[in-house]
Amino acid sequence: MVSVSRRSLLALGAALPLLGRLDWAVASPPPAKADKVRLNYNESPYGPSGAAREAMREAIATAGRYPYGHMYGLAALFAQQQGIAEEQVAVFSGSMAALRYAVLAFTGETRGLVMATPSYEVPRQAAESRKAPVREVDLNTEHAHDIPAMLAADPQAGMLYVCNPNNPTGTMTPTDAIRQALADKPKGSVLVVDEAYIDFSDAPSCVSWVKEHDDLLVLRTFSKIYGMAGARVGLAIGAPALLERLAVFGGDNVPAGTGLLGARASLEDVKLLPQRKALNAQRREETITWVKARGFTCTASQSNCFMIDVKQPAEQVIEKLAGQGVLIGRVWKNWPQWVRVTVGSKREMARFREVFAAQMSSV
């Protein structure tokens, strides 16, 4: 794992003015009541695995100590499983933090950000706080990243961001297209591939590519398929020199030991990913089939979320469903008639179908 150097800690002082300007997050809404069906944040309905919960409980006894050893151990295990060097893995308090630090490190007033739209908004927010130009490129007709258009959007770009599978659509960008982005991106820029949802899909990961490419950063999280959104553990994978540039902003901010040990236990549970992937796919496909049978269009998702064209202002549909206790995702401005739905449990998806049918019967 990349080490936190004295140099990076000193540089953090210079970075503080930038961090102070960051729009770290839009104000969070109050927690939903227990009886609400929460299909709005792409969370797992299952939470941490049994092994992860046990490891997290045991970690409480050591909470009086800084968990650096647990952090290094997690990085080492992930590196071993992926066939890469430990120095190519850095651990953060969620992959969102690593993504924000990447934008701060790789963009500036003369080196912009290129990303798709609709997509995850955090990099755009971070770039705007940096006063870096942002070029948002529409998804193509298959709802994948339009890589040729992204490559042409800004010849001086400092960072290209690809979320694969994409949030909010759940759709995939082909591996060959991502290779094209890596080969043809502006000189001196960094390609950041966000694989928060990759384990739900059938696509190969880009993690192994970091062995040959020092201008590629891959992000992973334990918030989605591992069900640990509240524990805040994420990974950045790349060349040590790239990770040092992130450490300037991340400093010595080690995640909590409970999350680190829960994450390690999750990686050690070899049955967890295939079980959850299959269960998610079953719930997703049966719901999409049901929605399409009623005349609505859905995105071809390989994630734990999908989008529906509701044929009317999406805000209205979100409000109607919320009134019946079913919370679904927000609206993306260039897709104003589409809603994002997180894939929940069997009970939650049954309730979603019941309420959706009742509220959309006249469409």
For the regions a language model picked out, list residue spans one by one.
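PLP-dependent aminotransferase-like
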Residues: 105-162
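Phosphate-binding glycine-rich loop
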Residues: 73-112, 130
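PLP-dependent aminotransferase class I/II
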Residues: 49, 215-299
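Conserved C-terminal alpha-helix-loop-beta "cap" of PLP-dependent enzymes
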Residues: 285, 292-361
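Active-site pre-lysine segment of PLP-dependent enzymes
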Residues: 147-155, 171-191, 195-225
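N-terminal secretory signal peptides and thylakoid transit peptides that target proteins
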Residues: 1-17
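N-terminal "arm"/small-domain region of PLP-dependent enzymes with the aminotransferase-like
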Residues: 13-65, 80, 156
